[in-house]
A protein has these predicted regions:
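Rossmann-fold dehydrogenase core element
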Residues: 207-224, 245-249
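Predominantly a Rossmann-like dinucleotide-binding segment in NAD(P)-dependent oxidoreductases
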Residues: 226-294
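Nucleotidyltransferase catalytic core that binds NTPs
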Residues: 1-130
Length: 424
């Protein structure tokens, strides 16, 4: 019996995929189809898939062409599979010509003609056409515009104050302007992704979320860290009981960029420390320990009293069975690490932890320690855009950051704005 194996993502299974499977099937007696897993696709920079692994497997199974379907989960698996399944022929599309010649050492490699005029990328772009404009200036907007180019079906377009010609808006203006800018976009029937905090008060936030629901629009709290694979896996590991009960979460986010701490610096157009770094630092605390803390204490060192611009701020939270703290600064420097303390071990994320691509689970016995590595492209921004586009397409809200977490973040910032803090 001649065994043939082929691999692919098979997102939105189309005629080209089916023709390739038919040609592969004709090469032998038994066809094995390897389907790339969601995580493996991310490591290869493929972030645009619209279907999950199980949906793609089901579509291939429905064709009746595959005798066996397996998941491709890591680089180098093809050699292992060829050996494990005693494969005679490796078949792949001609667009990979020469790429897999090294497999000739293990079996016969055949490059099959590719069906012209059809591709998953084109289908994804047709199915999901979202034009996004931006409100704001500076590095955040530039990064967002650059990363949007990597997302199928999403196009950035310059827009004026009327917001005409776009379906959605990215808001990265000064936090004090977020409420007005988001409200203007929602009134104009535009979906919105806004850098956190979405508003400076709970009343403003609730008004905006109510308006979005009333108009069936998507309003997303934009914290890029929430969308990275490593960060989401970190949450799962922490909540799984692997390190025991969580008793403390400590997050530090600082930067000296922008010369905020220099004498005579114009701070009027800059974000203060609590707005620039607070949402990111508070994210793992509220996602791991919840939002129902017993008390919070804010201690700050101000750069400018009239602008309420903090050079450094520390916030401590007390829960029933845990504590947490954040340190944020734009005119002070500390190690930007995240430490989650448990009764059996702890999780350590090195600086800059908010660009999470690696974390360690550590124990008293170092032989039990485990390191986790995950691909991170574009600081998580392109994953954020993909999630936003899917939310708009499916008309569902943001499940990466819950409404309760967004409110808890704003509540702390609101307390700071009211000067409910101790000054040092």
């Amino acid at each position: 019996m001649v065994k043939v194996i082929t691999y692919g993502t098979y997102d939105l299974l189309h005629f080209g995929h089916i023709r390739l499977l038919e040609r592969a099937k004709a090469l032998g007696d038994y066809l094995i189809v390897g389907v790339t897993s969601d995580d493996y696709d991310k490591t290869r920079g493929k972030i645009n898939n619209q279907q999950s692994l199980m949906e793609r497997v089901a579509a291939i199974k429905a064709t009746g062409l595959a005798d066996e379907i397996i998941a491709e989960e890591y680089e180098g698996q093809k050699i292992d599979d060829i050996r494990r399944y005693d494969v005679d022929i490796f078949a792949i599309g001609s667009d990979w010509e020469g790429k897999f010649d090294y497999l000739n050492e293990y079996c016969t490699v055949v490059y099959l003609p590719r069906t012209e005029g059809v591709s998953s990328s084109e289908i994804r772009a047709q199915n999901r056409k979202l034009t996004i404009g931006a409100i704001g200036e500076g590095g955040l907007c530039k990064k967002f515009i650059r990363e949007a180019e990597f997302v199928n079906g999403v196009e950035y377009k310059e827009c004026d104050d009327t917001l005409e010609g776009v379906d959605a808006v990215y808001v990265a203006s000064h936090p004090e302007k977020h409420y007005d800018d988001v409200k203007r976009a929602l009134i104009a029937d535009k979906h919105v992704i806004c850098e956190s905090p979405v508003a400076m008060s709970l009343a403003q936030y609730e008004e905006l979320t109510d308006l979005a629901k009333e108009k069936s629009l998507v309003l997303v709290d934009g914290i890029k860290t929430a969308y990275s694979t490593a960060y989401s896996r970190l949450l799962v590991v922490a909540k799984s009981g692997r390190i025991g009960d969580i008793v403390s979460v400590d997050a530090t986010c600082t930067s000296l960029a922008g010369e905020a701490g220099e004498e005579g610096a114009d701070l009027s157009k800059k974000q203060n420390s609590i707005c620039a770094w607070g949402p990111t630092a508070m994210l793992p605390i509220f996602q791991l320990l919840g939002t129902q803390y017993k008390s919070k204490t804010i201690v700050t060192k101000l750069l400018n009293d009239s602008l309420n611009f903090d050079a450094f701020t520390k916030v401590d939270f007390v829960y029933d069975k845990a504590v947490a703290s954040i340190k944020v600064a734009k005119a002070a420097k500390a190690e930007g690490e995240l430490i989650i303390t448990g009764t059996k071990g702890y999780i350590y994320v090195p600086a800059p932890w908010w660009k999470t691509d690696y974390f360690e689970v550590r124990f008293e016995d170092p032989t039990m320690n485990k390191r986790h590595f995950y691909q991170l492209d574009g600081e998580g921004i392109r994953y954020e855009i993909v999630a936003f586009a899917k939310a708009v397409e499916n008309k569902k809200g943001n499940y990466y950051i819950s409404d309760a977490v967004s409110k808890a973040i704003i509540n702390v910032i609101q307390s700071f704005s009211k000067r409910d803090y101790t000054r040092i």
